[in-house]
């Protein structure tokens, strides 16, 4: 068990350039919501702050991480433990307003880690962003 109610957690995921960053920023502007801000890491993504699972870059980076079997963490992952769940929260808490009703963590790999995150934080919510494929064409792969 962690020191935060998992029902307060909202995870946003989606492939790079699918709109996760602007969506999470707009969501974080709601008075009852806090997103990770002023973290000093790329796009204020929680994946770069936490010490538990490998970052998307280690699995090929933008878009490519989704094809790496090792990046697909599920409810059977050996990384699941109360200590790891708390370690992830401890890494994110300094960048949230803990008085907010809902706490948003946005990282593209969340799109393939929902089952893992749900096991770590039962009752948490997930939002998946997607975009038309042609909008992404040529950006990361040219």
Regions found by a protein language model. Name each.
Residues 106-109, 117-141:
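Conserved phosphate-donor/acceptor-positioning beta-strand/loop module used by diverse small-molecule
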């Amino acid at each position: 068990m962690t020191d935060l109610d998992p029902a307060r957690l909202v995870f946003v995921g989606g492939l790079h350039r699918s709109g996760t960053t602007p969506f999470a920023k707009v969501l974080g502007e709601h008075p009852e919501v806090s997103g990770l801000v002023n973290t000093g890491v790329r796009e204020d993504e929680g994946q770069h702050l936490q010490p538990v699972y490998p970052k998307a870059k280690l699995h090929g980076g933008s878009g490519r991480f989704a094809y790496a079997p090792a990046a697909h963490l599920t409810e059977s992952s050996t990384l699941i433990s109360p200590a790891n769940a708390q370690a992830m929260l401890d890494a994110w808490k300094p960048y949230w307003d803990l008085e907010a009703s809902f706490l948003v963590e946005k990282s593209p790999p969340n799109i393939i880690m929902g089952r893992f995150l749900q096991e770590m934080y039962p009752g948490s919510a997930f939002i998946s962003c997607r975009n038309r494929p042609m909008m992404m064409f040529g950006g990361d792969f040219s």
